[in-house]
Amino acid sequence: AAPADKPLVYACSGCSNVAQLANQLAVELDRAGRAQMSCISGVGGGVPALVKLAQSGRPILALDGCPLACCQACLAQAGVQADQHVVLSTLAICKRNGRACTHQEQAQAAAAVDAVLHCLTPHGHLA
């Protein structure tokens, strides 16, 4: 499918394990052709081309690591609300700095994101 036919995915990329996992999952969705990843810091920073893409009306999946919901807040700055929003720390994955998520936590988060993405597109399976 052409990029315009895919949902947009935005992810937190903060310093905690769950933030980095959110970014990793978004990259995997993009590389697998399941969604088009775009730059949330550009949206939050008001970069015109990136704000325009966020406001294009395409389905949006926002992946945040923790309840601070920085990804969701950046979208709100552009007047956009995600169609689906996942906060990884609500999946019983403890937020930690200086350590990566375990393989089990990664698999758990990938399964949750896959289920949510499937609501946006029938091709939403995370590889």
Show which residues each predicted segment covers.
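Iron-sulfur-associated redox domains of electron-transfer enzymes in respiratory
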Residues: 1-127
